[in-house]
From Swiss-Prot:
Single biological process term from Gene Ontology: acetate metabolic process
Protein's name according to its UniProt entry: Acetate kinase
Entry annotated with the keyword Cytoplasm: yes
Cited SUPFAM superfamilies: Actin-like ATPase domain
Gene coding for it: ackA
Organism field: Campylobacter jejuni subsp. jejuni serotype O:2 (strain ATCC 700819 / NCTC 11168)
Binding-site residues, Mg(2+): 7, 381
Pfam family of the protein (one): Acetate_kinase
UniProt function note: Catalyzes the formation of acetyl phosphate from acetate and ATP. Can also catalyze the reverse reaction.
Length: 396
């Protein structure tokens, strides 16, 4: 099948084109709504690039240029030649708990739950509507970050607030990065040559946004992110878990509005708030130069990660493997080392030489004697979205 995967942001569209699960092209529409907008399409088979720089006022104009570049490159005759288009959607809310093909109800529901993800869902919705208009005959699939976590038990996803907040307002833990956690856990099963239904793993997706997921027999049973992606780990610019009573205290102390506090927690906190950097390469360079705040930021990040992974050892009946994925998880050997060293008493024995090797691809980095496997699995959310889209089209 010919599948286009779209990740529509407020001012951008990222895309990948798959033909029978092989990436044929990828690209980006950036600075939508600005005069110096740019569209880049790259033929991934020969690395040839096709570019346009012009004013793009909206997503519809952006996708129209993408269509022109597909024709110019000869990769795809037209968007109507697609079998399907898979859209990454951050939040499905309580009712859209599974991936699905798009219809009028799905469009309305994505719009309704935009209040839960105001920075993401409206842009995703614009991407879907643009694709429907550009290629009416092509099936569109909504692939939700939250869907993988639909298998969490109620005692894991409920907050200890008055029940009406859940019952009437859908306030509960949803979890995110689901497409990534689903992909790497399935790849881990193949790597270990085990049935996914017999495997228990803890997946750590570590990027500027970061989350951990406890996966029992292929199903999510708990995850660190909650009602929003703010809960859980210390992240690049997000604070993660904190005492909620701090928020009214900060409001009175600094005279900040709710919106300003939200910005503070999401964009000015995390390791960035501690040391002024959110790129871990910069943080580790600063540590080498004796920057104590950078050292503190890294220690806080790793300590919170250790706490979550350790708690999921208690949640799972047994743990077969820990998976590191995402930009930091895949590339930062120091983070992996610091985390695994603190978990040694749980049967994790890291092979320091394997961990330090700068190689790409799926690999095992534990010592042969380790009771728990430690894997580095590069995530591929677009491939997973394409796979699920094919599956949904096949069923219908």
């Amino acid at each position: 099948m010919k599948i286009l995967v779209l990740n529509s942001g407020s001012s951008s569209i990222k895309f990948k084109f798959f033909d029978n699960k092989v990436v044929k092209a990828s690209g980006l529409v950036e600075k939508i709504g600005e005069q110096n907008s740019k569209v880049v399409l790259k033929n991934t088979l020969n690395n040839e690039s096709f570019e346009r720089e012009l004013t793009i006022n909206n997503h519809e104009e952006g996708l129209s240029i993408v269509n022109e570049l597909f024709k110019e490159s000869g990769i795809l005759a037209d968007l109507n030649a697609l079998d399907g288009c898979g859209h990454r959607i951050v939040h499905g809310g309580r009712n859209l708990s599974e991936h699905c093909l798009v219809d009028d109800y799905v469009l309305k529901e994505i719009d309704r739950v935009s209040i839960f993800a105001p920075l993401h869902n409206p842009a995703h919705l614009a991407g879907i509507k643009t694709m429907i208009k550009a290629a009416p005959s092509v099936a569109n699939a909504a692939i939700f970050d939250t869907a993988f976590h639909r298998t969490m038990p109620d005692f894991a996803y409920m907050y200890a607030l008055p029940y009406d907040f859940y019952d009437k307002h859908n306030i509960r833990r949803y979890g995110f990065h689901g497409t990534s956690h689903a992909y790497v856990s399935s790849r881990a099963a193949k790597f270990l040559q085990k049935d996914q239904n017999e495997l228990n793993v803890i997946s750590a997706h570590l990027g500027n946004g970061a989350s951990v997921c406890a996966i029992e027999k292929g199903k999510s049973v708990d995850t660190s992110m909650g009602f929003t992606p703010l809960e859980g780990l210390v992240m690049g610019t997000r604070c993660g878990d904190l005492d909620p009573a701090i928020l009214p205290f900060i409001s009175h102390l600094k005279g900040l509005t709710i919106e300003e506090i939200d910005t503070l927690m999401n964009k000015k906190s995390g390791v960035y708030g501690i040391c002024g950097y959110n790129d871990f390469r910069d943080i580790e360079r600063e540590i080498e130069q004796g920057n104590d705040k950078a050292r503190l930021a890294l220690d806080m990040f790793c300590y919170r990660l250790v706490k979550y992974i350790g708690s999921y050892f208690a949640v799972l009946p047994k743990t077969d493997a820990i998976i590191f994925t995402g930009g930091i998880g895949e590339n930062d050997s120091l983070v992996r080392q610091k985390v695994c060293e603190r978990l040694a008493h749980l049967g994790i024995e890291l092979d320091f030489e394997l961990n330090k090797q700068r190689i790409s691809g799926e690999r095992m980095i534990n010592h042969a004697n380790s009771k728990v496997k430690v894997l580095v699995i590069p995530t591929d959310e677009e491939l997973e979205i394409a796979r699920i889209t094919e599956e949904l089209i096949g069923k219908n």
